[in-house]
Amino acid sequence: MDSTGQDNSSSPNPPVPAAQAVPTFGDRVHDFEAHLPTLNQALSSIASFVPGFAGYKTSEDRRIADKQLRAVIGERLSKVKDRLDRVVDSLSRAGTLDGLALVDQSGRRLERLIDRMRFADYGYAAVFDRVQMGDAELARIYQYDAAIMGELGKFEDAMIEVEQGTTDGAHLRSALVKLDALTAEFDRRFEGRKHLFDGLPTP
C-alpha cells in the first residue's frame, strides 16, 4: 500500500485458457464415419428410390444393383425429356421459334445424360466389380447414391418452370438455364461415384 492508501499490489493474472488441440486427419475421418448412417439405414434409404434394390455386397449383386439404379434414373430422366419434347412441339405449332433452338439444345444435353445412365463405362464397371468394400464403404456409397436419387425431383420442378415459360421468352430462357445447370451438376455428381473407390483394395 502506498502513501495515498491505495493497494498497488498486482492483481492475479486471469487464467489462460488451455490451447485446443488441432484435430488430426485421422480425427476428422473418425468424426465423418461416426456420422455415417448404419449400413441398414443407408441401404433402406436407397431402396426407397429403387424397388428391389440388390445392394453392393457381392460382385454379382453390384452388377444387378448398378443396372437397377441406372434404369430408374434413366426412366425418370426420360420422362423429363418427353415433357421437353412436348414443349418443342408446342412451340413449333405456335410458330414461336425464338426459344425453340434453346429447348432443343437442353433436350440434347439431357439425352446425353440419359444415354450415360443406360450404358455403364467399362473401366468404371470393372473396378466396381472387383473392389473390396466393408460395411463403412458400403454405407458411404449407399448414402451417396441415395443423395443422387434425391436430386431427380429437381428436374421435375425445373420442367414445370420450362412449361410455364412457353409464352414468355425471358422466363423460358431462365428456366432452361436452371435445367441445364441441373443436368451438368447431376452428370458431375454421378461421375464422382467412381472416386468413392479410390484407394480401396482389389483382389
Name the predicted role of every residue range.
Residues 19, 26, 33-40, 44, ...:
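Low-complexity, intrinsically disordered regions enriched in charged/polar residues
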